[in-house]
């Protein structure tokens, strides 16, 4: 398994520039903390900070358990999987409120440009997670990931740099 992981990381490095994240002790400009969550215009609705209508509607349709027209922080924390494959989403602003998210599928989201998963400490970077997201130009990974799945960033032609946490082997 370790050989496959090493070969996969080597393959990523050929197509995308990578750099290891440095510990906050060695580099005070790069703290080992997640990015701040966006402000919530409606403190009772995590979707109120989302700037992508398709992502927002997906969340209302799938996670508004009590059907009050809002996705509360409690409802968001119960979400373990978000499947956005082949959706025309551009950003995932607000995804950090889904604190127990384990599985994210953005395969073939050709319009997706930026993703910040630094607050999603349980998410796994699975196989083909961002497969052919050709406009993806920036991604922030959680500092605690241990491995990156096969072809996770295959076809992400706009992605020129990924900071890979030190724990990834």
Question: Predicted regions span which residues?
Answer:
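Structural signature of tandem-repeat unit edges
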Residues: 89-103, 110-124, 134-147, 157-169
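Bacterial Sec-dependent N-terminal signal peptides
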Residues: 1-28
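Consensus positions within tandem repeat domains that build extended binding/scaffold surfaces
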Residues: 127-131, 149-154
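Disulfide-bonded cysteines in secreted/extracellular proteins and peptides
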Residues: 18, 47-49, 109, 133, ...
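N-terminal capping/linker segments that flank leucine-rich repeat
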Residues: 18-103, 119, 143, 166
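Intrinsically disordered, low-complexity serine/threonine-rich segments
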Residues: 11, 22-27, 38, 121, ...
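Small side chains
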Residues: 10-11, 15-17, 106, 126, ...
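Intrinsically disordered and other compositionally biased segments
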Residues: 6-7, 152, 166
